[in-house]
Structure formats: C-alpha cells, structure tokens
Amino acid sequence: MTERVQVGGLQVAKVLFDFVNNEAIPGTGVSADSFWTGAEAVINDLAPKNKALLAKRDDLQAKINGWHQARAGQAHDAAAYKAFLEEIGYLLPEAEDFQAGTQNVDDEIARMAGPQLVVPVMNARFALNASNARWGSLYDALYGTDVISEEGGAEKGKGYNKVRGDKVIAFARAFLDEAAPLESGSHVDATSYSVKNGALVVALKNGSETGLKNAGQFLAFQGDAAKPQAVLLKHNGLHFEIQIDPSSPIGQTDAAGVKDVLMEAALTTIMDCEDSVAAVDADDKVVIYRNWLGLMKGNLAEEVSKGGTTFTRTMNPDRVYTGADGSELTLHGRSLLFVRNVGHLMTNDAILDKHGNEVPEGIQDGLFTSLIAIHNLNGNTSRKNSRTGSVYIVKPKMHGPEEAAFTNELFGRVEDVLGLPRNTLKVGIMDEERRTTVNLKACIKAAKDRVVFINTGFLDRTGDEIHTSMEAGAVVRKGAMKSEKWIGAYENNNVDVGLATGLQGKAQIGKGMWAMPDLMAAMLEQKIGHPLAGANTAWVPSPTAATLHALHYHKVDVFARQAELAKRTPASVDDILTIPLAPNTNWTAEEIKNEVDNNAQGILGYVVRWIDQGVGCSKVPDINDVGLMEDRATLRISSQLLANWLRHGVISQEQVVESLKRMAVVVDRQNASDPSYRPMAPDFDDNVAFQAALELVVEGTKQPNGYTEPVLHRRRREFKAKNGL
C-alpha cells in the first residue's frame, strides 16, 4: 500500500510529498502551504475538464467507427467522409489568420537550426550525456560509426588504426573547406593556424599564408594567439572548433597539429517524462522529478564506469574564449533543455483528489516540473538553462484545439500558483494526432503566445491514423505506410502552417526521429531531407547522431529554405484525410507471416523490457537483428496494425498467438547476454510481459485512440506487485 499524507483535500503519496517539501521547494521562494493549496485548486478545477476532453475523444471515435460500419463493403466516398467529419466537429473551420506572439525565446529555439535529442529523464546517465551533447567530437563520430567505410584496411579494430584515422581527417578537412573556405588553397594543406591582428591566419605547405574567404567566420580562440589550442568558427548560425594539440596522438600525425573538429551539435534536448520512460507510480515519478531537479540546479551527477575506471559525470560548464577583438566570449556549454510532460490521457496514483480519484498525470507534471524549473529561473543553479527567463515544456498527444487551449489554461494556472509572469511557461505542440493535424492552425492559435515548437511525430501519428480509421478496412503494411499520400501531406502541412502563423524567428518547426542508431552512414545520406523540408530541428537517437546530423545544417541554410517553402501551395487537407487502406488484401501467406512476425517481434522486444525492467526506451533488435530505437510510439503502430488486420480477417487470433510465441523465443535469444533478463518462453500463460503484448494486439481496437499506456501501466504495476518491487 502507498503511504499517503493528507494535504487539504488531497491524499499525496508520502514519497512525493517529502520530495516536494524537502527537495523541490527550498530555494524557489514558494512556500509549501501556498504551493499545495494552489495545486489543490488547480486539480479540483481542471481534472473534470480533462476528463470531459477524454470523453469527447471517445465520442468522436465512436461516431467515426459507426460511419464506417454503416458503409462496410462500399467504396470509400472521400467527399461524404469529409462532410461527416465537419458535421461532427472533428474537422473544424480554418482559424482566422494570426501571427504567433511568443516572446523571450532563447536563440537555440528561435534563431538557430540544429539537431534535437530526446532522452528519458528517468535515466540520469542518459540525461547528462544529452545535456553535454551540445558539443561533439566529429573525429569520434566518424571513427566510431559506419560513416567511414572499413574498406582498404580501415577497420575499427581495438587500437587506433591510422588508415581509418586518415580517412576521418580527410572527411573533416573536406567539411572545413565547405563550411569555412580559405581565401586561397585548402585546409587539407594547412600547416598551422594562428591569430594575428584579430584575424585567422592559415599557413599552407607551399609556404604561403592565407585567411578565411569570409573573415567574419572567425570568432574567437583559446590559448596563445600565436599557437592557439582551439579556433572558433561560425557558419549558418552554428559554431565549430578546430582543436589543435601537436603533442596529442592524433595531432602528431597532422601537419597542422589538428587533433579534432568539435561540432556544435544538439542545440536543444527534450528531457522526457513521457513515451521513453516507464513511470507508473509515485516512486517512479519521484525519480523523474529528482533528475529534472538536478538538471535545473546544475548538480546532477552520476558515477560512470568505463574501461575499468570509474568517474563522476556532471553537466559541462560554459565554453570561454578570447574573442577576435580581444574581449572574453562565452558560449553555452550545454544543450538547451525542454521537458516533455505526459499528455492528457493517463492518471497516476501519486495524488488522489478529494473524491479519492487518481489525478491526471499531465496536471501533476505541469505543477511539479514547473516548480522545479524555478531554481533555474531565479539563479539557484550553477548551470543556467534559459537566458530569457522561459521554461520550455513539450506537450504531446493533444487532439485538436480544445485540448491545446486546455494546456494553455493549465499553464496559466500553474504560473499563478508559482508566482511566475504570464507566458513564462512555453509550450511545444506535438503534431502527432490526426485531429491536431487537420486543425493545426487553430491548435497553434490556442497557445499563440506560448508556442515555441511544433513537431511532426510520424510514429504516433501513424498509430492514430490506423486507429481512427480502424473500421474502414485493412490498412497497408507498416513498411508501405511512409509512401502513403496522407503522410507527405501531413509533413508538409506542419511546415506550411508553422510558417504561415509566424513561427520563424520565434519557434522550432521540427521533424521526427532517425530510429536506427547504428546506421549512421544511411542517416548522413537521408536525414538532410529534414532541413530541406524546412525543419530547423529534427530528432536524433544519440549524441553521436547529433554530431553527424549537425553537418546537414551546414549544408542547408534552413531559414533561407523556409523563405522558399513559404511561397508554395499549402498541403491539402483532402490529401491528409486520405485513409491508408490497402487497395487489396491478397498478400501471399509468406508476406502476411513476415508482417505479423516483424510486428510481433518488435512488440515483444520492447514490452518485455518495459514490464520486467521498467525501461521505456531502448535499442531493440528487429527480426533481422538491426537495432531500432523503440518507444511507446513504435509500439502503438505495431500493435494497432496487427489489431487492424485481426479486425478485418487478414489474420486470425491463432496466427497472432502462434507468432508471438515463436517471436518470444527469438527475443529471449536476443536478450540472452543480459543477466537481469527473464525469458518469456515457455511459460507464456504466467508471463506478465507476454500477456501484455498479447493484450495490446487482441484488445487493440478497444484501446483509447490506440494508446498503449493503459495496458503497459496496469501490467507493469502487476509485475511490480508480483515481484515485490
């Protein structure tokens, strides 16, 4: 039983109450009494509104299901369907024109373009690594990944391979020639870098000296001007450093003593309380809030063991240079942090209201993550986050403008409880639900003075696409979904609406995740598509990926690209509403088996770690042993696709069960080296994780909007209770 403290009409889990009063509040200037009194009023007033919004979701879904059921066997009538969506209030009239009014936004969001990390804040080591991923070694990112081929004797091996190292150096020099070209000659032929009279001087191997073609790209240096340790350059708004140390192992092999190129990489990071974590009770939530507190106070630390040595990882300090004019120049040493709260769906028993009901988790997150952020606003920190006095909160999984307006209201109420100026709390709107996509302009308008981010999350969005049209017929295979008409229109619409509502210079327009952290050569080739599509940020799965994705923002001037895109014909809502139905379902038995096995394996690989180990985001080997980043969004697609095929008779429940059992053996094998792993086979009936995976598919049509959280949370609590955790 959870030990509770009565606070007014609230029953608060003691572990949360003690954390808030003893750790979160001291140093904020907020009194415990006023906080809890204010929190209770917010909960009493807004929890019923939250509940009503969820009821509306269910009502609209029931009406859409009924419409499709009444037309079973008939060809889809797109015009009648659109008229029906308008009639039931799903598709609203377009909002009148407006411009976002957000103020006090940091440059990393408003005026720069670069990669964005998303990490589970429940994991302190991941959180620290991401915070410190503002700057990343290009040499390490190239040497350690498949960007540099192993052909011609360039294998990674255990020790340093000079053949491979030389390929890395050549790649980096080519980057320097592209991003910071010399007035004459090439960085390839540089023999030294020095600073004279406030300018960068580059000596070449032919004995001549030259400078930068654009002298203004040189900003600053570290060390002695005649023999600097680092030279700071800027291109397309992003910084990078040529690091020089002729005595270092790499510098010794370089004619100019260059040991590395340090890239400004993850400009921003989302510290995630949502899809990448497994938090089901007060104990779990306190782990999340405590790590967020450490980030906001600048004192988060973690013991890390590497290569037999143990050290303490902390948040990096700012970077200090001597500017070209001789004055001191300081650059932010860390990624600018957002915090992603949970959406409106789930409740959590960390707090019970005056009626004994669990309180919506999104309201709890809003109160506690904002309270904690005050430490960073008022200077009670050694590591400043926002320099403009803002708190950046990503709000996921909102359905339509009423829900965005509810978030705006919640944030206003939280500001009042905490004594913060209006619109201190900024909002990032995830465009990952169909009703938000088709009403995106109105959603932004509902939070127009807070909005700092819109982002397409195509994974969740695909899950909602399938569930919304569950009764319309069988959908295409998962791999074919990306080439369906709706998805291109959805991606373009996000950029079109963002630019039309004045987000440029005030907010990020973002794109989704590269989900294959080991396939960096493919990412380098393909992910340039995101800045070319007008996104001034896009998600990456690791600090290394952030360093490499930064190269794309040197190749593409995103803000110039946005100016071009603003002139195109906006995406069509009719295209967005095109349901991804399979034109026919005469797949071969082998094709069906492969699709079912692939999805079943992904579901099990993710769910078993979620339920048994409380891991909400992990690199899960797929059926071909390719590591894929999985979180609840990928689980939502896989489970909904199988539920859809089951609903329309493409597959039987027996096929699902048989595939899950076979794939459980595969997943067990893939996890055999993990000493804490509990095999699912052969005791399937008594294995909580296996039963959770099965339930997600066979009961998939009944899950609210296809979300996986209700099943996962219930089953994780069952596992914890069963094992005394």
Curated annotation (Swiss-Prot):
Pathway: Carbohydrate metabolism; glyoxylate cycle; (S)-malate from isocitrate: step 2/2. One of its GO terms (molecular function) is malate synthase activity. The gene is glcB. InterPro entries: Malate_synth_C_sf, Malate_synth_sf, Malate_synthase_TIM, Malate_synthG, MS_C, MS_N, MS_N_TIM-barrel_dom, MSG_insertion. Monomer. Keywords: Cytoplasm, Glyoxylate bypass, Magnesium, Metal-binding, Oxidation, Transferase, Tricarboxylic acid cycle. CDD domains: malate_synt_G. GO terms for biological process: glyoxylate catabolic process; glyoxylate cycle; tricarboxylic acid cycle. Involved in the glycolate utilization. Catalyzes the condensation and subsequent hydrolysis of acetyl-coenzyme A (acetyl-CoA) and glyoxylate to form malate and CoA. Its EC number is 2.3.3.9. It is found in: Cytoplasm. The modification Cysteine sulfenic acid (-SOH) is found at residue 617. This is Malate synthase G. Pfam families: MS_C, MS_N, MS_TIM-barrel, MSG_insertion.
